[in-house]
Amino acid sequence: IYVFNSRSASVGETLIGLKIQECEEAGMEFEQTVSTVEKYIESQHTYFVLENLDTLRKNGRLTGIKSFVASALNIKPVMGSTPEGTICQLGQARGMKRALAKMVDQIAREGKATKDKILAISHCNCPERAREVERILLDKIHVKASFIVDTAAISTMYANDGGIIVVL
């Protein structure tokens, strides 16, 4: 048994599961599968924008004052994960549309070698928003495939209604 640290969230873990399945179907040995999946995890990039910052405030990732000011001014942080898997702020914008545009631009800037990657998007009760993000991204980057899923379990609690998570 081997336990992977996804260093991602939501649909990032889905992509890791798909990579494990791909290795299994290719007949890889256990050690080769572990090595391949670890390299895959290192190559993943996770981005997200949340409609509501309450959960980040409640779990201590955002101070009450910052949360209050951001909510009052309609500031939406563009978030991502570090190579170690911790959450970091990549930028911010006023309003969800601008924050999503900033996230898409960030992904396009960083996503140079994406033709062999899968673009995966998860959303919390906002399928139209997810489809729009996918459409804009696919105009800017070339990927092997893309898909959209609903958030589930703990990811739904963290994303809150309106949250979008993108993993590439």
Model-derived features: positions:
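Mixed-charge interfacial surface used for oligomerization/domain docking
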Residues: 1-2, 8-168
